[in-house]
Amino acid sequence: MLNTLYSGNRLRVDFSKTPQQIEVPNLLQLQQSSYNKFLMLEEKDRSQSGVETVFQSVFPIHDTQNRLTVEYIDSEVGKPKYTVRECMERGLTYAVSLRMKTRLILWDRDENTKEKLGVKDIKEQSIFVRDIPLMTERTSFIINGVERVVVNQLHRSPGVIFKEEESTTSGNKLIYTGQIIPDRGSWLYFEYDPKDILYMRINKRRKVPVTIMFRALGYSKQDILKLFYPIQHINIVDNKFLMSFNPNDYSSRLTYDLVDKNGKILLASGKRLSAKKAQNFIDEGLSEVEYPLEVLLDRYLAKPIVDPETGEILFDAMTRIDETKLKKLSEIGVKNFSIANDLAEGVDGSIINAFNADADSLKLLKQTEDIEDENHLSAIRIYKVMRPGEPVTKEAAKVFVNQLFFDPERYDLTKVGRMKMNHKLGLNIPEYITVLTHEDIIESVKYVIKVKNGQGHIDDRDHLGNRRIRSIGELLGNELHNGLIKMQKAIRDKLSTMSGPMNELMPHDLINSKMITSTIMEFFSGGQLSQFMDQTNPLSEVTHKRRLSALGEGGLVKERAGFEVRDVHPTHYGRICPIETPEGQNIGLINTLATYSKVNEHGFIEAPYKVMKEGKVTDEIVYLTATQEEGKKIAAASNKLDKDGQFIDKMVVTRVDGEILHRPVTECNYADLSSHMVVGVAASLIPFLEHDDANRALMGANMQRQAVPLIKHEAPIVGTGVEKLVARDSWECVKARRSGIVEKVDGKHIYVMGDDDGEIYIDYYPLQKNLRTNQNTAFGQKPIVNIGQRVEIGQVIADGPNMDQGELALGVNAMVAFMPWNGYNFEDAIVISERLIRKDAFTSVHIYEKEVEARELKHGVEEITRDIPNVRDDELSHLDESGIIKIGTNVTGGMILVGKVSPKGEVKPTPEERLLRAIFGEKAGHVINKSLYCPPSMEGVVVDVKIFTKKGYDKDARTLELEKEERDYLEREHYDRLLMIDKEEMLRVTKLLTKEPLINDIKIGNTSYKAGDIINGEDLVEVNRFAMNAIIKSFSEEIQSEYNKTKNYFQKEKRLFRDEHEEKLNILEKDDILPNGVVKHVKIYIATKRQLKVGDKMAGRHGNKGIVSTIVPEVDMPYMEDGRGVDVCLNPLGVPSRMNIGQILEMHLGMAGRELGHQITKEFESKQKDFIKNLRAKMIEIADVAQMMNAAKTLGDMSDELLLHHARDWSRGVKFASPIFEGVNAVEFEKLFALAKMDTDGKTVLYNGLTGEKIKERVNVGYMYILKLHHLVDEKIHARSTGPYSLVTQQPVGGKALFGGQRFGEMEVWALEAYGASAVLKEMLTIKSDDVDGRVRAYKAITKGELVPESGIPETLFVLTKELQSLALDVEIFDEVEDNE
């Protein structure tokens, strides 16, 4: 399959070396599918939804005294009350109401035994739980009017994990540990200590020997030994100790002589027993051999030894054998006994050591608790470790141990945890058992012993098989569960304190949903994973929603996270982007999903691969998790391929478990899907990424997310082909829901007439304009289709911000020269031509929101008015009669935006005063000016005003005017839509009536038709509805019924439209919801145009960033031989040390694109007879440089009109896609340079713009894509003369937000001291800082034009004395020295 020439709505020459086999999955599907699983709003059967699962895990709730039970039946989710836009304007949460249906069962019970006898009464009730925030179509949430994103969390998967760590106490000895990690509940650790005793600890509490755990679970000593050791049976014959001969016991060299029962030495110590020899011995009838006495001593009994006569236990299991005990055995005539064989292969003495370690503590407990049974004592021991200092009974301890790991309410491994446990330990426990079993604990301990003996596999906690993703659905489910658990506890507490009859009880008396409300709101408004959405541009928004954070509840803490967690792991390949992560303390903790990766139902990330069979690549594509990939050989995408997509070489570069090796192609199981599956979306937008150093690529990926939307952005000449994907999956653009023809387009709507299953539909697409984003950038959509144009399903029909013809467009293509310019580009500074500023190339629009509230106060109500005391009329000229600024006003710092007066706290006026006031409206003296002023650094145009008024207060004239405008707009929109639906109806009817013959004669207009004729559609155009009803009777019944169906369908549609329209009008007239005490709320939106200025930060896509140092007149910039001036001068020294060579290649390719564009322009200008034919040939010649595209067919079949449209686009520069790791190579560069008639080194002769002299060296000139970042100098620079002061120190406050001063710190003081500038220093530390009287005197002197007087005492001195006095030191300050002191 060849790659397409289309990218978005334009043509782009794609240099991919491999065909694209599958579409990149929707970039936001993880969040969408996760939330859909949680609520399942669209599904009829919601029994499998996350909400249902959570409710069912908490209910039913039983009363301990068997009086009643609260059961859960089902839940119901409502509809949102407001639209997304209204929630954002009114500061509300976009949410749906969640109700649960509950059943309260009252039981009849036996008053003596308290046992249930039967059901007394059943009551059902639907209870409102709370509003659950609803995910918008753009996968964000609106919380209190602010758009937020819930980031996916990457946390440790539940399950079991085994590690080795260096001991902190005893030298370089390794300590082995195993951990059972649940999703909810207590963690269980098993660990060796330096003395080889195996311990267990719960939740990092004090450790206890592991045998205590088993005994608390009810295992006897004998059971435990049997579980962990092979049992050796010893027979006593003639004072000799014999055991059966088993060749498997002698796999290594013998440590003692092998002696048969007659005392004959069969094999000397130190020799090996071969299989052949062993077989000979068996053939000779050897069945028993002697167990050496020296080995038997220090072994332990596996079963108790009972006196044959009395039946009393002489020696219990775990008794250590010594000579006296052996003597005693032979004396009483014991014939055989069993020992635990701790010398066998694969076991060690750790369990025996643990028994020995626990004996002393149990002995002590026995005395204090007065209990004989050691199993009960073990349970008490665990209880005392977990809850030190609390009194305990043996029954309570037993229940406590059981609840720790075996109670579903307190312990949950989840299906994932159970799957991981089964996989690691080789168990077959069903998936639905999500608590621990005894088998889990036993097998885990066995595995720790195996690991210690070098047989088990040590886990890597950073392996992506041990880390999983919790997306929004699961995180929200956990929060809901936490809230329900609190509620459950509250219900149980309520029931335990209730007494008396319960017949009148209803479910709502017990259920208090406050607990749930608080946990969910806390999660959305204050949780670490719920973040303010980054809306700077479409890319930043998409990447924010694809982010994976290791922080948050249940995750890591960034201060304590080590280097390993942050590092790139081999399993990240194709799953997590190795490049895109923040710089600074979060590096490596916050990651992004790779482009093609998906997350499976268990939360593990999967990467796609092509299946290989017998060295051939097949078309089958599979998604594998990191665990499934283990041990598989995967051929890399960088290997050479032939035309059919098969590997050319017999030996290929292969990945096996993170190692990179050369392997025969026949051994490979899979092949990489594509070369850019390794990185994330932002990194795959960097062309020639393979030529950049990783650190710079990281900066490049991060800085693209900071690019501000420009007025005149353009798609890059040199792209990577990923631009269209970001545009496709971000909500900013408008995509066609069906294929069809564009019927009507204007700045606010698009109507597309499409057909679906043979039926005609007219789809309506509203466009949004001048909205403010979270980062104060302007959001607007503009149509990119024309009336009559054919659009396909999913095609972009309107661009959003930072989009150009359905592609992401973050910046501008500028002509760049790498050369110094009078020292102005020292240290990465950037020199820019004035031409770009004149062209508005880097101009952006920012919208700021200013708001003011009028409140109800104790002594009256604040008022929004034009009548403001002590303000001149000319300062109010731009306000309307309601005191609110008019839309379209140019504002600058210090102008009043909204006039507001607040009543003074005053003495009650006398009746006379009240009368005078009523007559003359004398108000000024009793109110103070609290108006909203424009901040000093802001200037712009008022683009919108929103006014909200509380119920019960009159709406002012301005509010009514705004409402009328909005109503008129809605009416117009409704009318337009009705016209369109009428047209749609007529088209369908016409189509229906022109396909079947008439059954009667009929006259339509001036045309007569006979029975059997087919009507001409044009005759029906002028027919009205009533006439149509008459015409239809001349058709068959089948057509008539079809016509009636169509008519009814459209009547229903119109009714729906009308209801929708009325709903909008109702919302418009609805009273506004305002916080308590607020009477009126006004929001003013100011749009500011920001041109590029000196001090703005700019960057390329390769991490090459800098600050604009000077803007040079166009005539002074260096120019080429044909007179074209350079736009930007960059410092050549910024390239070699940073090793981002990608920018040089991008420049060369960009220059080739622009030169070829000039050639296309010349073809246009030549206007010869067959210039279209020449254009087509030229475009085919250019596109044929890339091999993987059938350009001749695409361009050859294209209509002349469309070809001219694309040629005009290419005349501004031919657009290339150079995908990462398979971009333009040297051969292709040569071809392009030859076509573009450029020198092969890409350098150009330049002339000095100031002198006109030729510059001595030829210079590297080309087109580079340059972005303007949102660190704008206008938002940072700030100046103050006087302003607010800090209350205690009386020094000026700091920061632009508080209108603060410049900090003159300790080091700056040293600098002035070093210069000996004593007068300046004194001024800095007194009148410019905190000498209160001095600064007032200085201000007066400056305003009167006098000399500045001497400074006084700084406030700091008084603060110091007060501080010393607070430490009980009596410090006084005397103005002058008295004579007698």
From Swiss-Prot:
Top-level taxonomic group: Bacteria
A Pfam family assignment: RNA_pol_Rpb2_45
GO BP annotation list: DNA-templated transcription
GO molecular function, one term: DNA binding
Family matches, as PROSITE patterns: RNA_POL_BETA
GO cellular component: DNA-directed RNA polymerase complex
SUPFAM superfamilies assigned to the protein according to its UniProt record, in alphabetical order: beta and beta-prime subunits of DNA dependent RNA-polymerase
Keywords assigned: DNA-directed RNA polymerase, Nucleotidyltransferase, Transcription, Transferase
Known catalytic reactions: RNA(n) + a ribonucleoside 5'-triphosphate = RNA(n+1) + diphosphate
Protein task: DNA-dependent RNA polymerase catalyzes the transcription of DNA into RNA using the four ribonucleoside triphosphates as substrates.
Protein name as catalogued: DNA-directed RNA polymerase subunit beta
Species this chain originates from: Sulfurimonas denitrificans (strain ATCC 33889 / DSM 1251) (Thiomicrospira denitrificans (strain ATCC 33889 / DSM 1251))
